[in-house]
Amino acid sequence: MAFLKKSLFLVLFLGLVSLSICDEEKRQDEDDDDDDDEEKRGVFDIIKDAGRQLVAHAMGKIAEKV
């Protein structure tokens, strides 16, 4: 009976250790993804501002012709 208790304790302990390692890796991956999201937002803002300027310039040219 003591052998079964020790075996069960060992299995549970190893399971918890592997679970905590997986959680740490998941957190690191999420942190990396957050950095990528910030870069994507920065690029999107640049594209959006360029589009606004292009539309404003085109509208100005159309207004001059009318």
Swiss-Prot record:
One GO term of the biological process aspect: defense response to bacterium
Its localization reads: Secreted
Entry's InterPro entries? Frog_antimicrobial_propeptide (IPR004275), FSAP (IPR016322)
The membrane spanning regions, by residue number, are none
Name the keywords, alphabetized.
Amidation, Amphibian defense peptide, Antibiotic, Antimicrobial, Cleavage on pair of basic residues, Secreted, Signal
As stated in the Swiss-Prot or TrEMBL entry, residues carrying the post-translational modification Valine amide are V66
Give a yes or no for keyword NAD in this entry.
no
Keyword Phosphoprotein in record: no
Q: Where does the record locate the signal sequence feature?
A: 1-22
Q: Which residues form the propeptide?
A: 23-39
Tissue expression profile of the protein: Expressed by the skin glands.
What start-end ranges are recorded for coiled-coil regions in this protein?
A: none
Q: Name one GO cellular component term.
A: extracellular region
Family note: Belongs to the frog skin active peptide (FSAP) family. Ocellatin subfamily.
- Tell me, what does this protein do in biology? Has antibacterial activity against Gram-negative bacterium E.coli ATCC 25922 (MIC=300 uM) but not against S.pneumoniae ATCC 700603, S.choleraesuis ATCC 14028 or Gram-positive bacterium S.aureus ATCC 29313. Shows very little hemolytic activity and no cytotoxicity.
Q: What is this protein called?
A: Ocellatin-PT5
Species the sequence originates in = Leptodactylus pustulatus (Ceara white-lipped frog)
Output the lineage of the source organism: Eukaryota, Metazoa, Chordata, Craniata, Vertebrata
